[in-house]
Amino acid sequence: MKNKILFSFSNPMNSNSSNNIENNNNSNNNNNNFKNNFKNFSRKRTNDIEIEDNITFSELLLQKEVLKGLEDGGYQRPSPIQLKAIPLGISGVDLIAQAKSGTGKTIVFGVIALECVLRESKLLRQKQELNKTQLTNQTNKQLLEMDDDTYVETMVGIIRKPLVLIIAPTREIAVQIKDVIKSISKYCKRIKCEVFIGGLNSNNNKDENNNNILNNEDVNRLNGTQIIVGTPGKIKSLIENLHLRTDTLKMVIMDEADKLLDASFSKTINWIYSAIGNGNSNKNNSSSGSGIQMLAFSATYPSYLINLLKLYMNNENLVEIRLCSDTPSLEGIKQYYQIFRNDFTENNYKTFQNKCKSLVLVLEQVSFYQAIIFCNHKIRGEELTRQLNREGWPTAFIAGGQNQKDRLSTMSALKSFNIRILVSTDLISRGIDVERVNLVINLDLPKDHETYFHRIGRTGRFGTYGVSITFINMKSIQQQQQQQQQQQQQIENENENENNNNNEGFQEIDFINQLIQEYSVDITERVDNDIIPEELYSYQLSNPNDQQSLANLKLKQQQTILLNKQLEELKINENENENQYQNEDEEEEQEEDDYHYENQHQNEDEEEEQEEDDYHYENQHQNEEEEQEQQEEDDDNYNYENDNDSEEYEFIDDSIIEQTEYYYLNSNNNNNNNKNKYGNTINNNHYRNSSFNGPKNSINNNKFKNKNINNNDQRNSQSNGIKKKVNTNNNNFYPHYYNNPYPQNYYYDYQYFSDNSYYNNNYNNNNNNNNNNNNNNNNNNNNNNNNNNNNNNNNNNNNNNNNNNNNYYQQHGNNPYGYNIPNSIQYSSNQFYYCTCPNCPTMNYHQYI
């Protein structure tokens, strides 16, 4: 048995020329140095890229320009997929190729594409030399009618039409394919390869049909391009806008074909395939309807997809190469899984934080070069990136929703060794080739097994070694038992689909079991602080510049960690100072609060005391007023009781007055306008204050009952009821008011004025109208119906009969009817008045007759 040949690494992206096309010509010296270093460099690689025979690329019948480009890129001997697929692809057959990630599939279809262009160019040159020997006037006329590209092809022998179309599922893969082809075609003269992807224009202009409008830069780059690389959406736009000719295509290559044929891309791929078939209808030499060679490459092919893919192929010339259909994982990858038990929570932020803590422990334990961490959610990826950067790890994040320029910049930083960790969604789970990545961590479990193999395939590239760790969630035993009961119940109800959706904990652990059973994967469980042997992932870096870059990144990380510690200490000191100041402020505030509290309570106490004092003061004054009122009442009673006259006094109750009023009102219902309480037709005031200075006969309907207050209705508060003084020895008290010719018998109707006269309601004045009203209201007195003069005569006669003091009337006036009563009268009752004038010698009650 022949010795196995160890192959060189297939990573043209390591050179400085891989990042930018413009730098390719300036990096020839670096490539030559790298080539010389590589000749003396050898390292152990895995068996899945080894072949038994000692075969080189020169034995694969390749053009010398391609061979020279492969040699400069470090490719001396082919891998198994390269050895089998390149010769078949060059021969022109349709090809379905399956190989493990990182075994050199990009080199396979890159070489096949270059060979196709070189072959067509060679045929064109032969045809051009033949045309030169047969030039005629007719051919000269045809040359004038040719377009620019056809004229150049005919006269110079250079193809300026698209020959190869390469479709990739993501923009990052498309850019990488273009870089690989550029690196191995630098010795191929007049071959142009361009990549067309979306997201680079600052203004995403669209037409009325919501289709992308190509800018002039894309159109200019299409001129003279033989190999076109792009994403499905961009390729469709080029064809729709009639910028990409499909009638000249000779070959269509689908990288990551299983991804291109899933639901997200299948509609666009079918549209492109139909457009290519219509453009080549005149070359119908295959069952597929076109003369185009179809090639498909991927690391994984589901069983149903193979039959679907054959519909795009020429079945007569179809060849399948499936080198890893049973075990798609690479031999150089050591696979681990770590369980996170959700005893109380389920896929929440707490579980995410626990995973982040375990992740940091892994990064500290494993001496990795570069690492890729996959997340299922963009938000989690962004949060993880922030945490790792705070820990000092040079980390970047990439996802589909980002700006395309930022995505390209992030990939450039990863490939140029400017970062150590890249956090990503499934955007870069396929096709991305970075040799220095020797650690892959699945923070979240992928959705299917194919994605799992593509994720871990980012390490262990082309026979190198690496480690993959997958974090899975597992529910507690109690939750498992509950789910088992639910599962049995759902099976009885034939709801297996709902059971699969609700049983996330079992899905993740079953995912690992299926990897072991169906794909024979060697995967080991681990826990925190488990040591991962260095020989499982460590290897010597091929490029000396990588060693220096790694050392710089580690130094930067240490500086960042030191800076973070200093910032934390500074922050702690600031927090202590702030806490100290805060405590002092709180103490001051507390003192102020206590001070205000004491003042407030003191003020409240003072207010309460003031209220009590006011209350006592009011009560004291109220008592004094009551005592004063009581004293006045007692004085009044004393005056009544000590009267020197022999007449008897009594108080007539209000009921007597009310009875009298009732009797009067019932007999005078027709004359009740402007009547007082006792039926008197008046508009005057009851003035009982001798000091009232008003006009005679003034009327305001006010009752002045206190001798010391003007213009107020105040009856003395000490008097109880209306006092009536009756002379029992005199028959002057009549049973009815209008039977009394002397109205002074009713005290309540007295009117006192300040002009030495009094006025009675029933004898108002000498006005005839008032006399008539009084005569009409008196039902019992028929003699008073004439006029006021007759009433006055009667009063004079009655008064003369009872006159016992003629001297008094001579002193105060000769009017016996009270019209000239002096101003000094203070109080009167019935037939008596009390005089306080200095001319009165008795100063006592005097009978008024």
Swiss-Prot record:
Span(s) of short sequence motif Q motif: 55-83
Keywords: ATP-binding, Cytoplasm, Helicase, Hydrolase, mRNA processing, mRNA splicing, Nucleotide-binding, Nucleus
Entries under SUPFAM superfamilies matching the protein: P-loop containing nucleoside triphosphate hydrolases
Assigned EC number: 3.6.4.13
Stretches for region Disordered: 9-39, 480-504, 572-644, 667-737, 761-817
UniProt-annotated location(s): Cytoplasm; Nucleus
Pfam families associated with the record: DEAD (PF00270), Helicase_C (PF00271)
Enzyme class: hydrolase
Span of domain Helicase ATP-binding: 86-319
Domain comment in the entry: The Q motif is unique to and characteristic of the DEAD box family of RNA helicases and controls ATP binding and hydrolysis.
Similarity comment text for this entry: Belongs to the DEAD box helicase family. DDX20 subfamily.
Name the UniProt record assigns to this protein: Probable ATP-dependent RNA helicase ddx20
Gene that produces this protein: ddx20
